[in-house]
Design a protein with these regions (language model features):
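GNAT-family acyltransferases
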Residues: 3-108, 113-116, 129-133, 137, ...
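Conserved active-site tyrosine of GNAT-family acetyltransferases
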Residues: 158
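Glycine-rich acyl-CoA binding loop
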Residues: 119-124
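Conserved beta-strand-loop-alpha-helix junction that forms the acyl-donor binding cleft
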Residues: 145-155
């Protein structure tokens, strides 16, 4: 599986896998996503069929958009990346890091997939490529993730990508 990384003006904008393009949204595109998916689809020439932009998810994306705007040098750690199928340019999900790496060199990953695209290996393919890219960045030593105790699908993705469980209480914590 060849993974290509495209650089535009020195900034990574896209990670390519066998079936997917993982595209970093600009701070402006993040904002557009929260209030006008149709406009964003036109700009990116894609069709959005991933998680509905509502409720807690919308609040999270709005918060990340603010961080991305305030910290442009680190926006790739704050933005969401669209997971787009190469065959039909359909956005099936998104992936992000929740902040810049902390003082221990750790960053937390988050991800979600539209229901109709589950159980096709898209998220495993995405998490693997996304983590491979991240681990090549300066100062990053580990990627961590939090799952629900009963989140078997998410836990399988992390296990397939080499994550190991390191803590369990109300949720389960994983580290790569």
């Amino acid at each position: 599986h060849t993974r290509q990384i495209e650089f535009i003006e020195g900034i990574i904008m896209r990670i390519e896998t066998e079936r997917l393009n993982i595209i970093a949204l600009t701070p402006e595109q993040l904002e557009l996503w929260t209030h006008s998916i149709g406009e964003l689809e036109k700009e990116l020439l894609c069709s959005y069929k991933a998680e509905p932009m509502e409720g807690l998810f919308r609040e999270i994306v709005c918060g990340q958009a603010e961080k991305a705007k305030k910290d442009p040098d680190n926006y790739l750690w704050h933005t969401f990346w669209f997971i787009t199928k190469k065959t039909d340019l359909c956005v099936v999900g998104s992936v992000d890091f929740k902040d810049v790496p902390n003082s221990d060199g750790e960053v937390e990953i988050g991800y979600g997939l539209g229901r109709e695209f589950e159980h096709n290996g898209y998220m495993t393919e995405t998490v693997q490529a996304f983590c491979n890219w991240a681990l090549q960045q300066d100062k990053l030593k580990h990627i961590i993730a939090e799952t629900d105790v009963d989140g078997a699908s998410s836990q399988r993705i992390l296990t397939r990508c080499g994550f190991k469980e390191y803590a369990r209480n109300d949720t389960v914590w994983w580290r790569l």
